[in-house]
Regions:
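Noncatalytic regulatory segments and standalone regulatory/sensor domains
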Residues: 1-60, 254
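Short, well-ordered strand-loop elements centered on a beta-strand within folded domains, enriched
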Residues: 9, 65-72, 205-211
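Surface-exposed flexible segments
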Residues: 2-15, 136-139, 221-232
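Serine endopeptidase catalytic core focused on the charge-relay Asp
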Residues: 41-170, 200
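Active-site region of chymotrypsin-like
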Residues: 39-57, 122, 126-133, 156-253
Length: 254
């Protein structure tokens, strides 16, 4: 999140998961970890431009040929425009939008308590991606990997141990508090990494198992994950829940 507090969480209850399956989208316009800028405003020369700096978890194509990218719900509302982000986090002007948020669960009339948004990709650009992650996404899991990593546009790849699986939590973002179903791991992250992929080894294969939602602590200004010893915990929305939601609100995948 740019210009606001990173969401924080406190676990309330637990939820069981199911056996292992995954899929690799046949067509994926954005690589996992792609930097994104989102805003409900239009950039104007010489004027202040307020936008959210976030990351894409993965992308896929629907049966109706629309291409979709996945990020965090607190990154944007339906109707927000999306631009390709840069390595330094500064907005690159002039630039044409590459897409638009078409669904954001926190803003849905019938929310599923998931920190996830879907972006319809309608354009292309030079994308910044800080690393490579296999585009294999979990559709069901017997259990989450005990060791997971995340890829974000700001802190790149960081890894750590799983603390617990899916649980109801309280997410605080932009002064608002929301219920959110999320797992948690001891992984460092910061503003701008939200929406990025969380992944681990499932049956010997690197698999995306979630989407970065927030952290229990802030990374102090001027510090990095490499230079900071912290008990920070990362919360992430499960990919399995996102897959079910995508079919419900968007329709079948290609």
């Amino acid at each position: 999140v740019r210009g606001g507090e990173e969401p924080s969480f406190s676990a309330l209850s637990s939820k069981n998961l199911i056996p292992n399956e995954s899929y690799s989208p046949a067509t994926a316009p954005l690589a996992p970890g792609t930097a994104l800028d989102l805003s409900g405003d239009e950039p104007q020369p010489g004027a202040y431009f307020n936008y959210q700096s976030c990351t894409a978890a993965w992308s896929f194509t629907l049966a109706d040929a629309r291409t979709i990218a996945v990020t965090a719900s607190h990154c944007g509302k339906p109707g927000d425009k999306v631009w390709a982000g840069t390595a330094d986090g500064d907005f690159s002007y002039p630039a044409e939008p590459i897409g638009e948020v078409i669904y954001s669960d926190f803003y849905a009339e019938d929310s599923h308590d998931l920190d996830v948004a879907f972006i319809e990709i309608t354009g292309s650009a030079d994308y910044y991606v800080p690393g490579a992650v296999d585009n294999s996404v979990a559709t069901s899991l017997a259990h989450l990997p005990l060791h997971v990593c995340k890829l974000g546009r700001v802190t790149d790849e960081t890894c750590g141990t799983l603390i617990h699986g899916a649980a109801m939590a309280q997410l605080n973002s932009g002064g608002l508090q929301r219920d959110s179903i999320a797992a948690r791991a001891r992984v460092c992250s910061t503003n701008g990494d939200s929406g990025g992929p969380v992944y681990g080894e499932v049956e010997g294969e690197q698999t995306i198992v979630g989407v970065v939602s927030g952290t229990t602590q802030r990374l102090e200004e001027g510090h990095t994950c490499e230079t900071t010893q912290t008990d920070m915990e990362l919360s992430f929305t499960l990919a399995t829940d996102i897959q079910v939601l995508a079919k419900e609100v968007l329709g079948p995948m290609a």
